[in-house]
Amino acid sequence: MIISTLAFACMNAIVKHLTDIGAFQIVFFRSVSSLFFTFGFLIKNNIPILGNNRKLLILRGLVGVTSMSLFFMSTKYLPIGTAVSLRYMAPIFAAVFAIFFLKEKIKPFQWLFFTMAFVGVLILKGFDTNLDGYGLILIFISAIFSGLVYIVISKIGKGDHPVVVVNYFMVISTVLGGVLSINNWVNPEGIEWIMLLGLGLFGYFGQVYMTKAFQIAATNQVAPLKYLEVIFTLLLGVLLFSEIYTLYSLLGIALIIFGLVLNALYKGKK
């Protein structure tokens, strides 16, 4: 999951620069470039492309592309850091969904730790009274669908290879992203081509390792680690974009790490 969050943070940094390209077009390029990796891996290793749990695989693809599209759309209305932070309502939704769909139990102390980490995410970027209402709605719905992604992957379990799961997601995203971007297509120029292809590279590794994580561990144990993506994104902001963060940002990072460590220790004792 740590490898996954680092890869997604790199992808977020790229999205930050693609302000002139529509969300569905970004979805298309992010997905189509990943297909070279997924199809290549499956063919090389003689893994059945269609998989076993086909209905769940299709559902995972549809839920995933919905969440991803809404997230990219929200970045047009919200700062990328704010969008990434607010998307981290997803593990909270995943933990709640896991109670009903996976029959997992979450102890009261774990809810306290989840809350601590979530408060840290909010503090990390501060409270902005000028946030766009439409953007907030988009990112909120994106977080709900992202939480559902975790549940579907857990339902698939070890019945399908992680790359098969990712491949379904990429195929569905390529088709839907391509079709929905036709009317608003913008021809990339220069370095934008490299950035768009980079979306697929980082997105591929992010999806594969996230899928592996949820296949081998309980949702309520793995999902909170997704908060690390916020930390990685902020570090990239400092290193690549010379962004400056306040003491409130440092407090937010401390709360996130503290909440995750306490949850891991608590789960270990149980």
Describe the predicted segments one by one.
Residues 1, 52-62, 106-118, 135-140, ...:
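Cytoplasmic-side transmembrane-helix entry/capping segments in multi-pass membrane proteins
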Residues 1-24, 130-155, 270:
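Glycine-/small-residue-enriched transmembrane alpha-helix faces in small-molecule transporters
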Residues 1-6, 35-59, 108, 158-160, ...:
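Membrane-interface interhelical linkers
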Residues 5-9, 39, 61, 65-69, ...:
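Hydrophobic/small/kink-forming positions within alpha-helical transmembrane segments
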Residues 20-22, 28, 50-54, 126-145, ...:
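Juxtamembrane helix-entry segments on the extracytoplasmic side of multipass membrane proteins
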Residues 25, 32, 73-102, 219-236:
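Specific alpha-helical transmembrane segments that line the substrate/conduction pathway
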Residues 84-89, 156, 160-172, 207-239:
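Helix-helix packing/entry segments at the starts of transmembrane helices
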Residues 227, 231-270:
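C-terminal-most transmembrane helix of multi-pass membrane proteins
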